[in-house]
Amino acid sequence: MMKKLLLTLIKLYRILISPLFPPSCRFQPTCSQYALDAVEIHGVWRGSCLALKRILRCHPLHPGGYDPVPNPEQGKISS
């Protein structure tokens, strides 16, 4: 239930809010796609933590690049 709600909120952000701003994500996949994938793969708690950590790294001083969601087998959240 909570997972479905969170995924819906992220999708609503992508449809309603994201188009109002110019594209600025430094990463591939984008931060919103990363959040969707992270919650889908890791669940609400860990997926949200991974997404928040990614969003905090999405700024002009970080080089960005390809940064996929880690595999569930990787025990720790890493940068």
Curated annotation (Swiss-Prot):
Keywords: Cell inner membrane, Cell membrane, Membrane
Tagged with keyword Membrane: yes
Pfam family, one: YidD
Cellular component GO terms, alphabetical: plasma membrane
Principal localisation: membrane
UniProt-annotated location(s): Cell inner membrane
Membrane topology: Peripheral membrane protein
Primary role: Could be involved in insertion of integral membrane proteins into the membrane.
Family: Belongs to the UPF0161 family.
Protein name in the entry: Putative membrane protein insertion efficiency factor
Organism from which the protein derives: Synechocystis sp. (strain ATCC 27184 / PCC 6803 / Kazusa)
